[in-house]
């Protein structure tokens, strides 16, 4: 992103690329710590193992197993929105400040690739959230609708629901300022993520 902004030979593009890089690096940390919660609860790094851990219906999904898991999901979802530059976290391409951000000077297929990559990123982070917190391809009803075809349906449904939530939040919330964006990450999400990991550890020791 920095190279895309720098190569445009435009100050607005360079500012947008630098903002985007700083934002992604910052929000990777709380997102990663939220995934650590999933790994601690499922005791595996395998995504297939994580989904298998959640079989048995909707109340076995990690998001509903304990309050710390719900907090981890919320933090991951907010961080994922920030990483994909979705409103209210679209500071790198704020029209009122940077014209169009790092893709100001791009048009045609180059702009289309930037545009498509943003939506592809939304689907990827939503798929990871569905796998880690919402049971992946597992049916919400124990013992029913668990065939491979139904698994594809459940996985796509959960992913599309999270994508819809991202788009809905874009329509609903105003854009944050740069200082507010960084304060949310370093002063709110990161401390809560660290405390949340300790909470999950204690929960696991007490309740198994």
Q: Model-derived features: where do they sit?
A:
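Selective transmembrane helix interface/packing segments
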Residues: 1-208
């Amino acid at each position: 992103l920095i190279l895309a902004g720098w190569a445009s030979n435009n100050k607005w593009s360079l500012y947008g690329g630098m903002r985007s890089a700083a934002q992604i690096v910052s929000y990777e940390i709380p997102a990663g710590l939220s995934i650590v919660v999933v790994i601690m609860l499922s005791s595996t790094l395998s995504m297939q193992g994580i989904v298998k851990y959640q079989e048995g219906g909707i109340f076995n999904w990690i998001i509903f197993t304990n309050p710390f898991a719900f907090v981890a999901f919320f933090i991951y979802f907010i961080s994922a929105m920030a990483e994909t530059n979705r409103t209210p976290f679209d500071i790198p391409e704020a029209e009122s400040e940077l014209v169009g951000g790092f893709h100001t000077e791009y048009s045609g297929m180059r702009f289309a690739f930037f545009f498509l990559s943003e939506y592809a990123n939304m689907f990827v982070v939503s798929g990871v959230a569905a796998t880690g917190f919402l049971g992946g391809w597992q049916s919400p009803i124990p013992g029913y609708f668990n065939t491979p075809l139904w698994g594809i349906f459940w996985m796509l449904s959960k992913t599309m629901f999270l994508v819809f939530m991202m788009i809905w939040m874009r329509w609903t919330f105003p854009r944050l300022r740069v200082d507010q964006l960084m304060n949310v990450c370093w002063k709110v999400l990161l401390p809560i993520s660290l405390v949340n990991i300790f909470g999950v550890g204690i929960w696991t020791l007490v309740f198994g």
